[in-house]
Amino acid sequence: MDVRHRNHVKVTGRAGGPVVMLAHGFGCDQNMWRLVVPLLEPDFTVVLFDHVGAGNSDLSQWNRERYASMDGYADDVLTLCRELDLGPVVFVGHSVSAMMGVLAAAREPGMFAGLVLLAPSPSFIDDPATGYRGGFSAEDIDELLESLDANYLGWSGTMAPVIMGNPDRPELGEELTDSFCRTDPEIARLFARVTFLSDNREDLAAVEVPTLVAQSSHDAIAPPEVGAFVHDRIPGSRLVTLNATGHCPQLAAPEETAAAIAAFAGTTA
């Protein structure tokens, strides 16, 4: 199997430079990083890819059993690292991909020079028993998934602007809506369940590689308490709160996002 084809891999930037691997979130593809990439290319080897089922990945490689949990995606990340053979990478995971990086690094820490967890959430669902605040009640998530199942395109048009934030810049929400609408609805329904129902809180403590937790100053999907929780649970991690708002700072504030990635990667890669 050619993983470069399967995951539509692109390698760009400075040959021989420290390696930064960028992983997109739900309903997106590698194009979400397009404003950040030119800012990283002068100093880093940049690896872009699409998760199987997203973007220009090989859809024939998608199957329900493998991608019904975060584990299948984490396995793909490790396979990419091995097959590309670029040495330890700084893995930058946005949103749900942050937890894929956590799982992958816990399994094979030698593959990673570090992790950047951008707008991460180990669980979107509040847990009153422990006091954990994920931002949504279980009922909220059930309603969200029911709405997605009933009318994926309609759900995309409603939710994308909420996820993106920045209501004064509606073009950002429109871009995310378009990205959602390009995703196969069947694949999106399953990936939404992986995204919104997974609970990776107990996996955080297993991370041993240098980690930067980067969160927006206001994010309707992952409130500040979530970033603080991730930082608290990953030993030795750093936490930075960006001035950016919304759940996709790589689009809303690419310069600030790239600067945070570069500052961290430059000290760990």
Feature locations, PLM:
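Catalytic active-site module of serine/aspartate enzymes centered on a nucleophile-bearing elbow/loop
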Residues: 237-269
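Conserved alpha/beta-hydrolase "nucleophile elbow" surrounding the catalytic nucleophile
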Residues: 24-26, 89, 93-95, 216
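Conserved alpha/beta-hydrolase catalytic His-Asp/Glu region
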Residues: 126-127, 131-135, 146-205
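Acidic catalytic loop of the alpha/beta-hydrolase fold
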Residues: 218-222
